[in-house]
Structure formats: structure tokens, C-alpha cells
């Protein structure tokens, strides 16, 4: 998400929502970082990711950036934001585009496949722990039926990114 933020217009209002603050957006002039908080020993004062996502919609964002989608309610609110016209960026742990769709449409997130058409692209990245290099493995578009169609994919033998479908 840090890398893609270089393509954001600097004067846009960006709201980021994270469990642990990892994003750094120095070029963004109007960045509002929101971070979850654990409750105190009495069990009060905790701030959940869902609360922050819901509140971010009230802050008139140009873009919403969510560190990681883990729960059904978070995903539902994000997709609702997408369907109402907000630009939303988020991460999810998956090994490829098809697995991303499966993670979103099966428990614990369990969204209906039809609403996935709100997604434009799925970008799958991987960090090679041996070489400590980050690589984009796949770029896929989400079709109206909710399936992913691979557009570009890494050729690991040539270490090049190749067009699969146009």
C-alpha cells in the first residue's frame, strides 16, 4: 500500500485504517491515519477496526486505505463503501487471485460473490525471504460474476512480468 500511494494525488483526503500503523504517506497533504486500540485493563476504551472503517466514511475521504481485512463485518462495510462510490484499497493474505476470491467468499468473511464486482483489480505480491525481494505475482480483474481473470503474471523462470489476457 505504501508503493501504490505514490500514485495518489497529494492534495486528496486519504483516510488509513490499520491495526498497527505501518503506512507512511509523506507526500499526502491531507492524510488521516486511524489505528485500533486495545481496551484498558477494565475492558474499556478499545477501538475496533470496524468502528474506524465506519467512522472513516463520515470523514469525507477521497480514498480509504485499510491495512488488512480479517473479518466479515469489516469486509461488508468496505464493499458498501465501494458500492457508494468511495475509492477503497485494502490488503488480504492470499497466494493468488483465485485464492483471494475464495477467502472473500468463504468463512470467516463469507461475502456473496455478486458483490465482488465492486473490486476492479486484485494485485498479488510476494516477498521472497531468501532474496528479500518483493515481486508482483499476478494482476487480475474481477469479472461481473465475481470470478478473477488473470491479466498479467510473473514468469518465475525469466523473472519477467508477462501479459496473460488482454
Where are the predicted features?
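Switch/coupling sub-region of P-loop NTPases
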Residues: 3-114, 118-128
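Conserved P-loop NTPase
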Residues: 121-166
Amino acid at each position: 500500500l505504501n508503493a501504490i500511494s505514490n500514485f495518489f494525488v497529494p492534495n486528496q483526503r486519504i483516510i488509513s485504517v490499520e491495526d498497527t500503523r505501518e503506512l507512511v504517506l509523506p507526500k499526502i497533504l491531507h492524510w488521516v491515519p486511524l489505528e485500533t486500540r486495545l481496551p484498558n485493563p477494565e475492558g474499556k476504551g478499545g477501538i475496533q477496526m470496524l468502528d474506524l472503517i465506519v467512522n472513516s466514511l463520515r470523514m469525507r475521504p477521497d480514498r480509504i486505505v485499510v491495512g488488512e481485512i480479517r473479518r466479515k463485518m469489516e469486509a461488508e462495510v468496505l464493499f458498501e463503501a465501494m458500492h457508494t462510490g468511495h475509492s477503497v484499497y485494502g490488503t488480504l493474505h492470499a497466494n493468488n487471485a483465485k485464492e483471494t476470491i475464495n477467502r472473500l467468499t468463504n468463512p470467516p468473511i463469507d461475502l456473496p460473490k455478486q458483490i465482488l464486482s465492486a473490486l476492479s483489480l486484485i494485485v498479488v505480491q510476494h516477498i521472497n525471504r531468501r532474496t528479500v525481494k518483493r515481486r508482483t505475482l499476478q494482476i487480475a480483474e474481477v469479472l461481473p460474476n465475481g470470478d478473477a481473470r488473470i491479466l498479467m503474471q510473473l514468469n518465475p523462470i525469466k523473472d519477467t512480468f508477462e501479459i496473460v489476457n488482454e
